[in-house]
């Protein structure tokens, strides 16, 4: 049952209780008036108001236990007729009690500089919250990456609700917006320690290696944060804190959330919609060396770009070999064929959650010819609506993130950071359908279909059969000891945090 349905159910139940209790009280009071003429009308009104108020307070308390909501006032699953309810819920101001502050002996201060795109940084922030809590240190609001390919100058407060971040986690860890003045002076004088922590580390590494440095220098700066905490073999309470930071602590700014609500409302007014994370931007193709379907000029342009960034270590890449291994994003042509084979209705709205597609309309034509209702945020909103996040790729990505969470189906064409983090968040919201494409299988089938070795019926049936169990449902993570890059990513499937959802759905975790 989605949250909107729960809201209606509880509201009807509440009204029934009020009616029953109200009638009972009034009947008794009327009898009392007959027997005792001294009872006055104002007492009836006072008791009725008191009763209604107590019921309302109870309802609010129950409402706060329903779990996280994606956007303020939104249900976690949608029908297009739900919006009057959503509006009514939004109009009810609720004062949420803050958790009590956790009192602990502070061992020092942890500064972190996140690297990568929005979703890589999002996961890293959750890891840093957990690490700071475990070491009993004070976390300084993380610094976001401003020097990578995206060159986005956004600060933490430009993307996330920083006050909510601090207050919602204060019963676990102390978070400050900046260092105290005396420690700022130490940092200016260089009296602190900076380092990149080892990737995929467990908690004993932070306890034995990092904590002594914090105690010695008072301030430690971690200048790399991507995948610095292991996927597995961590205590359950550690994993659950990672989830709490991700699903409750990190909330986008009101401006981004409001814009997200507007886009989803526009889409919902026309029916269901699918979000396609078409990872076919120039930077992705240049970095990965994937140029299938590109012309000679485009291949040379992508190669030049790859050599222009020295921190992109791999330079000589066999594009076709990489594609056959399933390591390339699907092209727009391959994507159109795959969606058709999966049985996606050609009239469904497809929202493209991505930057500028390489090759523009020429490459998108293969997709729009089959699925004519392809839209983007730029086509749904006026340019003035997006002006505040223009040239801020992380803020644009935050908007796409929100819309991806609320879609009926989410389909990423490449299994990058956004695909993984959104998949895990959609699992948390009730195992919402996310199609994890098997690219290695798909390119093999697509090539055989183009070569005439497979009929459409066989091609489509095979694609559907192999993806029937790749829809974002309950399952355990694949664990590969000593090979963290090859095993399932924690944030794509945080199953330690989903046990209640499994039980409510009558499902058990399947071994993979």
Swiss-Prot record:
- E.C. code: 2.4.1.351
Sites of glycosylation?
Answer: 136, 202, 223, 391
Q: What class of enzyme is it?
A: transferase
Pfam families to which the protein is assigned, alphabetical: O-FucT (PF10250)
- One GO process term, biological-process aspect: cell wall organization
Q: Please name the pathway.
A: Glycan metabolism; pectin biosynthesis
**Chain ranges passing through the membrane:** 41-63
The source's domain of life comes to Eukaryota
Question: InterPro entries from the entry?
Answer: FucosylTrfase_pln, GDP-Fuc_O-FucTrfase
Q: Name one GO cellular component term.
A: Golgi membrane
Location relative to the cell: Golgi apparatus membrane
Which keywords appear in this protein's UniProt record, sorted alphabetically?
Carbohydrate metabolism, Cell wall biogenesis/degradation, Fucose metabolism, Glycoprotein, Glycosyltransferase, Golgi apparatus, Membrane, Signal-anchor, Transferase, Transmembrane, Transmembrane helix
- What name appears for this protein in its UniProt entry? Rhamnogalacturonan I rhamnosyltransferase 1
The gene behind this protein is: RRT2
């Amino acid at each position: 049952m989605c949250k909107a349905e729960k809201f209606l159910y509880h509201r009807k139940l509440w009204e029934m209780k009020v009616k029953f209790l109200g009638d009972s009280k009034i009947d008794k009071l009327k009898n009392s008036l007959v027997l005792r003429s001294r009872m006055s009308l104002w007492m009836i009104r006072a008791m009725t108001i008191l009763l209604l108020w107590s019921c309302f307070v109870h309802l609010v308390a129950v409402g706060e236990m329903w779990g996280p909501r994606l956007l303020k006032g939104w249900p976690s699953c949608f029908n297009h007729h739900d919006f009057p309810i959503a509006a009514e819920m939004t109009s009810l101001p609720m004062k949420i009690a803050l958790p009590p502050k956790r009192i602990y002996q502070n061992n020092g201060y942890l500064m972190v500089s996140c690297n990568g795109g929005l979703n890589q940084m999002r996961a890293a922030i959750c890891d840093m919250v957990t690490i700071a809590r475990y070491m009993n240190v004070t976390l300084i609001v993380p610094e976001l990456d401003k020097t990578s390919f995206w060159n986005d100058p956004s600060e933490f407060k430009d993307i996330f609700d920083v006050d909510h971040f601090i207050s919602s986690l204060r019963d676990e860890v102390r978070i400050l917006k900046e260092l105290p003045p005396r420690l700022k002076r130490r940092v200016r004088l260089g009296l602190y320690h900076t380092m990149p922590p080892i990737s995929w580390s467990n908690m004993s590494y932070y306890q034995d290696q990092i904590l002594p440095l914090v105690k010695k220098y008072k301030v430690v700066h971690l200048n790399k944060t991507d995948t610095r905490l292991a996927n597995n073999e961590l205590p359950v309470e550690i994993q659950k804190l990672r989830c709490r930071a991700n699903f409750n602590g990190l909330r986008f700014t009101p401006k981004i959330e409001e814009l997200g609500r507007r886009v989803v409302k526009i889409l919902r007014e026309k029916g269901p919609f699918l979000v396609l994370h078409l990872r076919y931007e120039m930077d992705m193709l240049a970095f990965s060396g994937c140029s299938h379907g590109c012309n000679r000029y485009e291949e040379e342009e992508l190669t030049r770009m790859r050599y222009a960034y020295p921190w992109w270590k791999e330079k000589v890449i066999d594009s076709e070999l990489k594609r056959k291994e399933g390591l390339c994003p699907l092209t727009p042509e391959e994507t159109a064929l795959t969606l058709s084979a999966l049985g996606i209705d050609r009239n469904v709205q497809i929202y493209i959650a991505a930057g500028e597609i390489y090759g523009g309309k020429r490459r998108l034509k293969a997709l729009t010819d089959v699925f004519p209702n392809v839209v983007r945020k730029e086509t749904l909103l006026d340019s003035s609506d997006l002006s505040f996040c223009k040239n801020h790729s992380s803020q644009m990505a935050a908007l796409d993130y929100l819309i991806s969470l609320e879609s009926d189906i989410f389909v990423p064409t490449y299994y990058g950071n956004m695909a993984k983090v959104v998949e895990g968040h959609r699992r948390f919201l009730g195992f919402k359908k996310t199609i994890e494409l098997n690219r290695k299988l798909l390119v093999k089938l697509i090539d055989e279909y183009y070569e005439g070795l497979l009929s459409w019926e066989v091609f489509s049936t095979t694609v559907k059969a192999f993806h029937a169990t790749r829809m974002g449902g309950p399952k355990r993570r694949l664990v590969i000891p000593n090979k963290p890059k090859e095993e399932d990513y924690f944030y794509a499937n945080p199953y330690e945090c989903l046990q209640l959802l499994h039980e409510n759905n009558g499902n058990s975790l399947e071994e993979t």
